[in-house]
Amino acid sequence: MRCSHKLGRFLTPHSCFWWLFLLCTGLSWSFADGNGDSSTYQYIYNLTICELNGTDWLSSHFGWAVETFVLYPVATHILSLGFLTTSHFFDALGLGAVSTAGFVGGRYVLCSVYGACAFAAFVCFVIRAAKNCMACRYARTRFTNFIVDDRGRVHRWKSPIVVEKLGKAEVDGNLVTIKHVVLEGVKAQPLTRTSAEQWEA
């Protein structure tokens, strides 16, 4: 578990890290020097969505694909501010779609780069989903506040205030003799005792 925690912290600096890197690469393509025969020019071209322009899948819809490619990471980043796990899922989904399109179109360099990013985003999603499930399980099955009576029975108790009647505590309508009170997982000590009066009309 410790290894997975470090891996998740390494891979998730931000939800849109991989998208931002690839977007900057695409912008740098516009300012690259040289002509179409330049190896640097061609290398940068292979790493952007422009590589899909000649495929059958995207040749007739390239305009909206570019708009989606720019707006999609912005949307996932905004989503990550409140829903990080969902953002990781959509990151993996979007990157996987580009990788699949590259594989179908025979653009294997593009496919491998985006596939690696999609896999990293999916790993982040799995780690976050596992942590969410563990947190939900802990919240539903682990209780840190409870009362132990003189018979060894454990009673759930949320309040730091215990009401006593005839020297016993009233728990769920029953009177029990307190042996220990545990708050936030730590054995508690009585702080103050206050007498109370009950009035009826």
UniProtKB/Swiss-Prot annotation:
One of its GO terms (cellular component) is viral envelope. Pfam families: Arteri_Gl. Glycans are attached at N46, N53. Coiled coil: none annotated. N-glycosylated. It is found in: Virion; Virion membrane. GO terms for biological process: clathrin-dependent endocytosis of virus by host cell; virion attachment to host cell. The chain crosses the membrane at residues 64-84, 109-129. Residues 1-32 form the signal peptide. Residues 33-63 are virion surface. InterPro entries: Arteri_GP5. Its main location: virion. Belongs to the arteriviridae GP5 protein family. Heterodimer with the membrane protein; disulfide-linked. This heterodimerization is required for transport to the Golgi complex. Interacts with glycoprotein 4. Interacts with host SIGLEC1; this interaction plays a role in virus entry into host cell. Interacts with host B4GALT5. Major envelope protein present in abundant amounts in the virion envelope. Mediates virion sialic acid-dependent attachment the sialoadhesin receptor SIGLEC1. This attachment induces virion internalization into alveolar macrophages predominantly through clathrin-dependent endocytosis. This is Glycoprotein 5. It comes from Porcine reproductive and respiratory syndrome virus (strain Lelystad).
